[in-house]
């Protein structure tokens, strides 16, 4: 019996050449709507779906393949005598190939002016039904949903006269991944439209961006996936201009650096190591900002990741060229800057739109046996809600330093302490199990620069010991959430040493 293929695609990439190859193998082709028209315009002989179903396409194409003559031909088990007898009795012919991809729901809802009605109209019904039927019966049916697989199928047909069983299984698995992702997009869209924040089930879909050499360590396998609607201001959508492929650790560090530099509207540069900032500087231009970020910690910046929120110019590139760096990420690089930096063949140069999100996206964290979901911490300092419980208020310069330190501390692993002075960080204490331990690290790193600096803490002081350490180091201003039952003890210490202290009422733990 002559083999038959059903072809109905929204993505027309390569379909004419593929169908031509099928016809050359003696395979009869059935098609629908726009696909049929395209194939016929290219001189290919195909059969209309209505000739198979004996029923016209109706309801603006909503119903065309939902018919027993189609699904019987797809689902029939060819070595089952009962199935074969029923097919013969009802005049159903088998379908051996299904070439289908689905209505462009993702592309539709990505449009800024999309209406709810447009989105609903682009939910495919017949397509998923066909490919699921074919994939279930993959022992007898080859189902192709991705143009990438056209050449594989044709090559096996030309070589063996049939598609290998292993290939059919792989294609079937791809179908169910495809429909699962498609349905996840639809369910998430409708859930968001209804304003449901914590649905009873959560289905997420990501698209592979690249395989990675390894994970956090060489013995760990890893892959990088991107969210279908991730912000363009993200590492997932960055353009790599130069250098080696990004590693797992590179991606984590670049993401951390990008998150911090987005906090600033003035020219800013952030240096990151192991997802913690080691130096942050702001200035009147990007060269000045980089100089301050470098001077913040000239030791730790070696082998680090740099993020800037302005174009990298030649003079800044020349300074960057002087040290070993893994990545530089910026909105753009001048032609002269690229010439300087591309002389380092392994240095990764990325461009990305630097834009702070105004809405909190969801942050997913895997734990053993489950998944934690929360809003991203995008909250900025609200000066209308702060309080100053100390006798002295911060000076103008102290306010500048406090604000810089507060922007940075929310991105440091808790317990977190950041010291800032003269438009740059001068000490970062990260990830200690007690707050005073982080303070001591930051103060030690700052050395003599701690005198007259500002301190930010991501959470309140449970005891006044951190204030005591700050006072001994000559720190003159502190910003912290407040809210401890021992706040009064800290306020007394601050007043004793003439320290200005600001309560924000907002905690910024980061784990």
Curated annotation (Swiss-Prot):
This protein's pathway: Purine metabolism; IMP biosynthesis via de novo pathway; 5-formamido-1-(5-phospho-D-ribosyl)imidazole-4-carboxamide from 5-amino-1-(5-phospho-D-ribosyl)imidazole-4-carboxamide (10-formyl THF route): step 1/1; Purine metabolism; IMP biosynthesis via de novo pathway; IMP from 5-formamido-1-(5-phospho-D-ribosyl)imidazole-4-carboxamide: step 1/1
Superkingdom of origin organism: Bacteria
UniProt-listed InterPro entries: AICAR_Tfase_dup_dom_sf (IPR024051), Cytidine_deaminase-like (IPR016193), MGS-like_dom (IPR011607), MGS-like_dom_sf (IPR036914), PurH-like (IPR002695)
PROSITE patterns attached to this UniProt entry: MGS
GO cellular component, one term: cytosol
Keyword annotations of the record: Hydrolase, Multifunctional enzyme, Purine biosynthesis, Transferase
EC annotation from Swiss-Prot or TrEMBL: 2.1.2.3, 3.5.4.10
PANTHER family referenced in this protein's UniProt entry, alphabetically: BIFUNCTIONAL PURINE BIOSYNTHESIS PROTEIN ATIC (PTHR11692:SF0), BIFUNCTIONAL PURINE BIOSYNTHESIS PROTEIN PURH (PTHR11692)
Domain notes: The IMP cyclohydrolase activity resides in the N-terminal region.
Similarity-based family: Belongs to the PurH family.
Protein name: Bifunctional purine biosynthesis protein PurH
């Amino acid at each position: 019996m002559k083999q038959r293929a059903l072809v109905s695609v929204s993505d027309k990439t390569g379909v004419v050449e593929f169908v031509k190859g099928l016809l050359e193998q003696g395979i009869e082709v059935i098609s629908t709507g726009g696909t049929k028209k395209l194939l016929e315009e290219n001189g290919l002989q195909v059969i209309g779906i209505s000739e198979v179903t004996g029923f016209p396409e109706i309801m603006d194409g909503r119903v065309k393949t939902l018919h027993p003559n189609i699904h019987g031909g797809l689902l029939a088990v060819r070595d089952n005598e009962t199935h074969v007898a029923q097919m013969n009795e009802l005049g159903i012919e088998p379908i051996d190939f299904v070439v289908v991809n689905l209505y462009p729901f993702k592309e539709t809802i990505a449009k800024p002016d999309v209406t709810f009605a447009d989105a609903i109209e682009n939910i495919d019904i017949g397509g998923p039904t066909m490919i699921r039927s074919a994939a279930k019966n993959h022992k007898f049916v080859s189902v192709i949903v991705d143009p990438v697989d056209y050449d594989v199928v044709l090559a096996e047909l030309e070589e063996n006269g049939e598609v290998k069983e292993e290939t059919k299984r792989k294609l079937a698995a791809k179908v169910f991944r495809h429909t699962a992702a498609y349905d996840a997009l639809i369910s998430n869209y409708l859930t968001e439209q209804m304003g449901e924040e914590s649905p009873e089930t959560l289905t997420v879909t990501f698209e592979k961006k690249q395989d990675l050499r390894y994970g956090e360590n060489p013995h760990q396998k890893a892959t990088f996936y991107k969210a279908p609607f991730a912000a363009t201001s993200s590492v997932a959508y960055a353009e790599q201009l130069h250098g080696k492929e990004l590693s797992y650790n590179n991606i984590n560090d670049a993401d951390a650096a990008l998150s911090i530099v987005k906090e600033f509207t003035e020219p800013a540069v952030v240096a990151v190591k192991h997802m913690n900032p080691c130096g942050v500087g702001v200035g009147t231009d990007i060269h000045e900002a980089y100089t301050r970020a470098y001077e913040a910690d000239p030791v730790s910046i070696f082998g680090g990741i740099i993020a800037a929120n302005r174009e990298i110019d030649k003079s800044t590139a020349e300074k960057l060229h002087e040290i070993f760096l893994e990545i530089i990420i910026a909105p753009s690089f001048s032609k002269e800057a690229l010439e300087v930096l591309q002389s380092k063949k392994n240095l990764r140069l990325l461009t990305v739109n630097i834009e702070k999100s105004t809405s909190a996206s969801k942050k997913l964290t895997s734990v053993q046996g489950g998944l934690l979901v929360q809003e991203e911490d995008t909250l900025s300092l609200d000066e209308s809600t702060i309080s100053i419980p100390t006798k002295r208020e911060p000076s103008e310069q102290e306010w500048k330093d406090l604000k810089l330190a507060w922007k940075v501390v929310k991105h440091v692993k808790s317990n977190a302490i950041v010291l800032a002075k003269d438009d740059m960080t001068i000490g970062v204490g990260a990830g200690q199990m007690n707050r005073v331990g982080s303070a001591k690290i930051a103060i030690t790193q700052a050395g003599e620069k701690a005198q007259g600096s500002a301190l930010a803490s991501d959470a309140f002081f449970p005891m006044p010991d951190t204030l005591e350490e700050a006072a001994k180091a000559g720190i003159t201003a502190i910003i912290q959430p407040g809210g401890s039952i021992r706040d009064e003890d800290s306020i007394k210490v601050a007043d004793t040493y003439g320290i200005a202290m600001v309560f924000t009422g907002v905690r910024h733990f980061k784990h």
